């Protein structure tokens, strides 16, 4: 086992491990980090690191649920413009769907709810990275769609 490793080494190794997209549990990450010489690592610290770096659980190529750091994710900071968190805006005849960076949907939905009916939004439902927008009227869904797109400077 190696002598004490620096916090920078831990972060670098942690990110490298997550890029492998093969660890489905925090205990597996703990074991991998311990095998790399970080003897003082535990599940609690791994949990905090996963949160700090914006890790998400997703399916890998083998359809296994694993932790990863998606490239497009850039963890939002206090100075991040909200428009950077909106990845896609689409619609059908009755609903508008907004896809966001993981973890940003509820924040964006709250903003959309606050502008509400005057802008054609009856309400929203948000998950982790997807928002369903119910327009005030399906007859004006195109106008509501344009309002949402302009709010986030989104262009097709």
From Swiss-Prot:
List keywords of the entry alphabetically.
Answer: Amino-acid biosynthesis, Arginine biosynthesis, Cytoplasm, DNA-binding, Repressor, Transcription, Transcription regulation
What the protein does comes down to:
Regulates arginine biosynthesis genes.
The record's family statement is: Belongs to the ArgR family.
NCBIfam families per the UniProt record, alphabetical: argR_whole (TIGR01529), PRK05066.1 (NF003457)
The protein's matches in Pfam families, at most eight in alphabetical order, are given as: Arg_repressor (PF01316), Arg_repressor_C (PF02863)
* Keyword Flavoprotein among UniProt keywords: no
Task: Identify this protein by name.
Answer: Arginine repressor
Q: Where in the cell is it found?
A: Cytoplasm
Q: Which GO terms describe its cellular component?
A: cytoplasm
- Which pathway, metabolic or otherwise, does it act in? Amino-acid biosynthesis; L-arginine biosynthesis [regulation]
Q: Which InterPro entries match?
A: Arg_repress (IPR001669), Arg_repress_C (IPR020899), Arg_repress_C_sf (IPR036251), Arg_repress_DNA-bd (IPR020900), WH-like_DNA-bd_sf (IPR036388), WH_DNA-bd_sf (IPR036390)
Which SUPFAM superfamilies does the annotation name?
A: C-terminal domain of arginine repressor (SSF55252), Winged helix' DNA-binding domain (SSF46785)
- For this protein, the parts annotated as crossing the membrane are none
Biological process GO annotation list? L-arginine biosynthetic process; protein complex oligomerization; regulation of arginine biosynthetic process
> Which gene is this protein's source?
argR
Q: What is its main location?
A: cytoplasm
| GO MF | arginine binding; DNA binding; DNA-binding transcription factor activity
């Amino acid at each position: 086992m190696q002598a004490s490793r620096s916090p920078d080494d831990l972060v670098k190794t942690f990110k490298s491990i997550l890029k492998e997209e093969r660890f489905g549990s925090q205990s597996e990450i703990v074991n991998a980090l311990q095998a790399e010489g970080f003897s003082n690592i535990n599940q609690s610290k791994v949990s905090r690191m996963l949160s700090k770096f914006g890790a998400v659980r997703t399916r890998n190529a083998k359809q296994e649920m694993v932790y990863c750091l998606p490239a497009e994710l850039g963890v939002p900071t206090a100075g991040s413009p909200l428009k950077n968190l909106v990845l896609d805006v689409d619609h059908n005849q009755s609903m508008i769907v907004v896809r966001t960076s993981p973890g940003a949907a509820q924040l964006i939905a709250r903003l959309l709810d606050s502008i509400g009916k005057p802008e054609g939004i009856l309400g929203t439902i948000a998950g982790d990275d997807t928002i369903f927008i119910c327009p005030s009227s399906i007859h004006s869904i195109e106008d509501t769609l344009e309002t949402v797109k302009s709010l986030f400077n989104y262009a097709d």
